[in-house]
Amino acid sequence: MITATALAILPLAAACGEEQAGQQPGSGTVRVEPPVTGTKWNIATVTADGTTHRTKGDAQIAIDPKTGKLGGRLGCNHVNATATVGDGHITLGAPATTRMMCEASLMDTERALLKLFDGKITYRIDQNTLTLTSANGTSVRASAAK
């Protein structure tokens, strides 16, 4: 009888404390963050020179894991650059952009976003939000496209 009781209690005891990282307590599901590469990221805000701005236009980026290239739009112009992804950081090459002129707010967004390029930046993904931060203090928050 004691053996049967112990066997009945054992699975219950083992289940205690089995929440996994990224899992909401009691939800029964594990949140899986999108990877930094192969995901289209819609840029929501950019912080440069101590000021945060919501992006204007269609600002988005994606890193192709096969080619090691970043491509996207900076609000007005298209951008391409090499992108080497490491543990918690990305090394971006010098950007190549198209040269269209757009309204001033779009060009301001673009100038701020270009401050991320040509160097090593850190990245973090939390709740489908990508945060990029450069050594010069420029940071970007972007959400995974659906």
What residue spans do the PLM features occupy?
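Lipid interaction determinants
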Residues: 1-146
